[in-house]
Amino acid sequence: MASLVPLKEKKLMEVKLGELPSWIMMRDFTPSGIAGAFRRGYDRYYNKYINVRKGSISGISMVLAAYVVFSYCISYKELKHERRRKYH
């Protein structure tokens, strides 16, 4: 049975594997579309973890942990070479 929701309006987790290539081609890959996607993601994160009634440190600590992991991954190449040095 065909889905009642058009393919363009489906979320990624609702798309079947056979529909995935056509769903990807329907996405907006212009700079404004990509900026809009990042904006929606930021708004979703902000409303879920930061802008809550009983807020805690968890939302900000997740961002901080992601920053630490990301910066470690970026500087891993230099850290790998420093690990083998004995004196300098």
Curated annotation (Swiss-Prot):
Keywords: Acetylation, ATP synthesis, CF(0), Hydrogen ion transport, Ion transport, Membrane, Mitochondrion, Mitochondrion inner membrane, Phosphoprotein, Transmembrane, Transmembrane helix, Transport. GO terms for cellular component: mitochondrial inner membrane; mitochondrion; nuclear membrane; proton-transporting ATP synthase complex. It is a single-pass membrane protein. The modification N6-acetyllysine is found at residue 16. It is found in: Mitochondrion; Mitochondrion inner membrane. GO terms for molecular function: proton-transporting ATP synthase activity, rotational mechanism. The modification Phosphoserine is found at residue 3. Subunit f, of the mitochondrial membrane ATP synthase complex (F(1)F(0) ATP synthase or Complex V) that produces ATP from ADP in the presence of a proton gradient across the membrane which is generated by electron transport complexes of the respiratory chain. ATP synthase complex consist of a soluble F(1) head domain - the catalytic core - and a membrane F(1) domain - the membrane proton channel. These two domains are linked by a central stalk rotating inside the F(1) region and a stationary peripheral stalk. Belongs to the ATPase F chain family. PANTHER family: ATP SYNTHASE F CHAIN, MITOCHONDRIAL-RELATED (PTHR13080), ATP SYNTHASE SUBUNIT F, MITOCHONDRIAL (PTHR13080:SF16). Component of the ATP synthase complex composed at least of ATP5F1A/subunit alpha, ATP5F1B/subunit beta, ATP5MC1/subunit c (homooctomer), MT-ATP6/subunit a, MT-ATP8/subunit 8, ATP5ME/subunit e, ATP5MF/subunit f, ATP5MG/subunit g, ATP5MK/subunit k, ATP5MJ/subunit j, ATP5F1C/subunit gamma, ATP5F1D/subunit delta, ATP5F1E/subunit epsilon, ATP5PF/subunit F6, ATP5PB/subunit b, ATP5PD/subunit d, ATP5PO/subunit OSCP. This is ATP synthase F(0) complex subunit f, mitochondrial. The lineage of its organism: Eukaryota, Metazoa, Chordata, Craniata, Vertebrata. The gene is Atp5mf.
